């Protein structure tokens, strides 16, 4: 693979699926604030004029689901019927039930350290030294473009922007190293009064140029800004949204494998979420320690069982020390049982709403992004 292209995409906080993710995680956070041991599996569906919140929740906490939903939509920016969705007037339906006692008996144990996994499943974590946050560049810059779209929309720089947007960036690689950006796609919802030429110029100057490094842009880079020419109808009016439908956007943009489990709305007893975070933490510390340039971790679990049923480490031939040393380091320095990883990453806190837009990884404010084990790993591996 001497020369190749690789593409990832992202979506904004106003994309219908991301509205759903943020509502689900807002509910989770509100419950964890009162009851850190709650069991939460919250799903959301949004469509024109309506939000349905459902799932299984077992908790001693009380949360005003309707007001929380409206506040979340309001923060995103859907506050007027002209946008096709209005936080103040949309219907909010609540269909939440309790978690099955059959699941509880496998998860809850007398000794917390023996807490079983909330379900079976496989989870992947990944890191590479392509960017300063040890994430693949295509997904990193796709996120940054739609983050910038939200910033200039909310601060009034481009007041005619609306909340729904998508980005996509294609990078050129040679011998596994970035040599440039081949293509950029950015589609953004807008009000009816802005012309397409004015929109394209403003998006280029205020969003794309400030975000993408100039050294990766050339005369051959292709830019596609609102390529259909018009994007007035968007958000839940354009498409329905569902929790958990942007799992590749949430993770590595397709640069690493995915176990299939979504994150948003799930408390940390659900290993779909917590073990994926732990796998990222392990992979990132291995790369930060200089043990490998790229690292992918796979974990698997059985419902009600504490220890992972398997741990896989893949370094794609980039390892700087023997594979056996890396595997032994993972076993020695990372507790990957459900209780252990919750404690290791301090997951029983209300930090999840922020994760629900612009990616769960590569953002230093989250505990699974810490590289606090890198020094231990270096010492263990004898890396100077």
Swiss-Prot record:
HAMAP family per the UniProt record, alphabetical: S_AdoMet_synth1
Official protein name in the record: S-adenosylmethionine synthase
CDD domains per record: S-AdoMet_synt (cd18079)
Catalytic activity: L-methionine + ATP + H2O = S-adenosyl-L-methionine + phosphate + diphosphate
GO biological process, one term: S-adenosylmethionine biosynthetic process
Stored PANTHER family: S-ADENOSYLMETHIONINE SYNTHETASE
Gene Ontology MF terms in the entry: ATP binding; magnesium ion binding; methionine adenosyltransferase activity
Record's subunit section: Homotetramer; dimer of dimers.
Cofactor(s) recorded in Swiss-Prot or TrEMBL: Mg(2+); K(+)
Binding locations of ATP: 15, 164-166, 230-231, 239, 245-246, 262, 266
Entry binding sites for L-methionine: 56, 99, 239, 270
Keywords: ATP-binding, Cytoplasm, Magnesium, Metal-binding, Nucleotide-binding, One-carbon metabolism, Potassium, Transferase
The gene coding this protein: metK
Cofactor note as given: Binds 2 divalent ions per subunit.
Xref: PROSITE patterns: ADOMET_SYNTHASE_1 (PS00376), ADOMET_SYNTHASE_2 (PS00377)
GO terms for cellular component: cytoplasm
NCBIfam families: metK (TIGR01034)
Region ranges (Flexible loop): 99-109
Gene3D superfamilies reported for this sequence: 3.30.300.10
Keyword Transferase: yes
Residues that bind K(+): 43
Record-stated family: Belongs to the AdoMet synthase family.
Binding site for Mg(2+): 17
Organism expressing this protein natively: Vibrio parahaemolyticus serotype O3:K6 (strain RIMD 2210633)
EC number in record: 2.5.1.6
Pfam families in the cross-refs: S-AdoMet_synt_C (PF02773), S-AdoMet_synt_M (PF02772), S-AdoMet_synt_N (PF00438)
Subcellular location, record wording: Cytoplasm
């Amino acid at each position: 693979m001497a020369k190749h292209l690789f593409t990832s995409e992202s979506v904004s906080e106003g994309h219908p699926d991301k509205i759903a993710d943020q509502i689900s995680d807002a509910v989770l956070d509100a419950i964890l604030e009162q009851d850190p041991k709650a069991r939460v599996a919250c799903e959301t569906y949004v469509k024109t004029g309506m939000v349905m919140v459902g799932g299984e929740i077992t908790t001693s906490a009380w949360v005003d689901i309707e007001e929380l939903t409206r506040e979340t939509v309001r923060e995103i920016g859907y506050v007027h019927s002209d946008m096709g969705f209005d936080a103040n007037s949309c219907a909010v339906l609540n269909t939440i039930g309790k978690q099955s006692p059959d699941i509880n008996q496998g998860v809850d144990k007398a000794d917390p350290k023996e807490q079983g996994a909330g379900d079976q499943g496989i989870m992947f974590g990944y890191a590479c030294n392509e960017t300063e946050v040890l994430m693949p560049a295509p997904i990193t810059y796709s996120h940054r473009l739609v983050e910038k779209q939200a910033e200039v929309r909310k601060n009034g720089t481009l007041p005619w922007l609306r909340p729904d947007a998508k980005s996509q960036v294609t990078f050129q690689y040679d011998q596994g190293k970035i040599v440039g950006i081949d293509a950029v796609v950015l589609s953004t919802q807008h009000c009816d009064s802005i012309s397409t030429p004015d929109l394209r110029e403003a998006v280029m100057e205020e969003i794309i140029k400030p975000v993408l490094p100039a050294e990766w842009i050339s005369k051959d880079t292709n830019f596609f800004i609102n390529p259909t020419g018009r994007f007035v109808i968007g958000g839940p009016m354009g498409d329905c949204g569902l929790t958990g439908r942007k799992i590749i956007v949430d993770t590595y943009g397709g640069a690493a494998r995915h176990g299939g489990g979504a994150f948003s709305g799930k408390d940390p007893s659900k290993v779909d979420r917590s073990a994926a975070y732990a796998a990222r933490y392990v992979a990132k510390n291995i790369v930060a320690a200089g043990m490998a340039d790229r690292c992918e971790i796979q974990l698997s679990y059985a419902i009600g069982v504490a220890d992972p049923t398997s741990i896989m480490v893949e370094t794609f031939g980039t390892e700087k020390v023997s594979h056996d040393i890396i595997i032994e380091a993972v076993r020695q320095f990372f507790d990957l049982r459900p209780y252990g990883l919750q404690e290791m990453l301090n997951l029983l806190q209300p930090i999840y709403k922020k994760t629900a837009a612009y990616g769960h990884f590569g953002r230093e404010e989250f505990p699974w992004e810490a590289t606090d084990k890198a020094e231990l790993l270096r010492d263990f591996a004898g890396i100077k």
